[in-house]
C-alpha cells in the first residue's frame, strides 16, 4: 500500500505505511528528502515495485541485478505476462542468498505462468530434463502470492533405434527442441508454450514404433517405443516448480512439479 495522495491524511497514512511516527523517519523510509514537506510523501511506498512482462527467453540475471541495486530495501516483483527461462540449466527466476533486501514479494498475476524451460528430445538417446521455474536462496524473506501458475519444464521424450530407424523424442513443454531422426514418416516436434512435442513415427509398416512424447509441464518425457525390437531410451525428468529453501507462501495457487 502506498501513502495516500493530496488531499488526504498523509501523516496517518505515512505511519501506517512505514511504522514510523516521526515524520522525518517516515520520509527516510520512503526515500524522500529530509527536511521536507509532508506532501512529498504522497503516493510513496516503503517498498520499491518492479514488473516483468511476457518473455519466451527470460534472463534471470536481469532481475537479480535490479534487486541487488535496491540494497536492503524491500521490493515487490509483479509478473504480468508468461515468462520462460532461457535455458533448462538455469531457473526462470532466481533469488540467491546474496540478496540483502528485507524481503522480496513475488506476485504472479491471474492467467500468468512462470515456466522452467522444456527439455530437448533425445536423438537415439535419452531425453533431457526440464528446467526449474523458481530457485529460492533467501528462505522466508521470499513471499510468494501465486494468482496464476508456477510450472517446471516438461522432460524431453526419449529417442531410440531399430535397425536403420533412428527415433527422436518430442520436446518438453515449453520450447524443448525435438530430437533428430531418420527413416521416419514424421519427425519429432518441439514443445510450444501450450503443448509438449510429439515423438517421431517410423516409416511404412513400422508406424507403430515411435519416439517418446515430450512431457507436459511438471511431467517427465515419455519413453521411446520400438515394441522391444530395438533400443529404447527413457524421457527426461520433469523440472521443478520451486527449489531451494521454502518461501513464505501467501498464496500457493496452481503448481506443476514439486515445490518446497
Swiss-Prot record:
Q: Where is this motif: GRM 4?
A: 162-173
Ranges spanned by the short sequence motif GRM 2, renumbered to the chain:
125-132
Q: Where is this motif: GRM 6?
A: 185-191
| Family annotation (InterPro entries) | Gp38_N, Receptor-recog_Gp38
Record motif GRM 10, residues? 228-240
Q: Which GO terms describe its biological process?
A: adhesion receptor-mediated virion attachment to host cell; symbiont entry into host cell
Question: Motif GRM 1, which positions?
Answer: 116-123
What is the residue range of the motif GRM 8? 210-216
Q: Where in the cell is it found?
A: Virion
Q: Which family does it belong to?
A: Belongs to the receptor-recognizing protein gp38 family.
| Name assigned to this protein | Receptor-recognizing protein gp38
Taxonomic lineage: Viruses, Duplodnaviria, Heunggongvirae, Uroviricota, Caudoviricetes
Amino acid at each position: 500500500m502506498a501513502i495516500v495522495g493530496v488531499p488526504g491524511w498523509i501523516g496517518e497514512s505515512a505511519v501506517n505505511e512505514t511504522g514510523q511516527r516521526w515524520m522525518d523517519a517516515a520520509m527516510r523510509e520512503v526515500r524522500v528528502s529530509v527536511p521536507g514537506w509532508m506532501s512529498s510523501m504522497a503516493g510513496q511506498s516503503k517498498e520499491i515495485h518492479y514488473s516483468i512482462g511476457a518473455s519466451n527467453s527470460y534472463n534471470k540475471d536481469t532481475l537479480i541485478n535490479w534487486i541487488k541495486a535496491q540494497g536492503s530495501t524491500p521490493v515487490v516483483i509483479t509478473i504480468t505476462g508468461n515468462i520462460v527461462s532461457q535455458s533448462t540449466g538455469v531457473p526462470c527466476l532466481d533469488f540467491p542468498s546474496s540478496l540483502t533486501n528485507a524481503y522480496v514479494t513475488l506476485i504472479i498475476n491471474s492467467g500468468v505462468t512462470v515456466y522452467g524451460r522444456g527439455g530437448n528430445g533425445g536423438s537415439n538417446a535419452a531425453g533431457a530434463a526440464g528446467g526449474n521455474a523458481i530457485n529460492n536462496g533467501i528462505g522466508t524473506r521470499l513471499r510468494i502470492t501465486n494468482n496464476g501458475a508456477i510450472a517446471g519444464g516438461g522432460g524431453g521424450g526419449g529417442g531410440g533405434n531399430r535397425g536403420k530407424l533412428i527415433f527422436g523424442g518430442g520436446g518438453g513443454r515449453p520450447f524443448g527442441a525435438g530430437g533428430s531422426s531418420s527413416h521416419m514418416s514424421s519427425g519429432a516436434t518441439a514443445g510450444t508454450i501450450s503443448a509438449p512435442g510429439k515423438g517421431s513415427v517410423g516409416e511404412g509398416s513400422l508406424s507403430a514404433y515411435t519416439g517418446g512424447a515430450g512431457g507436459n509441464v511438471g511431467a517427465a518425457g515419455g519413453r521411446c517405443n520400438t515394441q522391444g525390437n530395438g533400443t529404447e531410451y527413457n524421457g527426461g525428468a520433469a523440472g521443478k516448480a520451486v527449489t531451494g529453501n521454502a518461501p513464505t507462501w501467501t498464496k500457493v495457487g496452481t503448481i506443476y512439479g514439486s515445490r518446497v
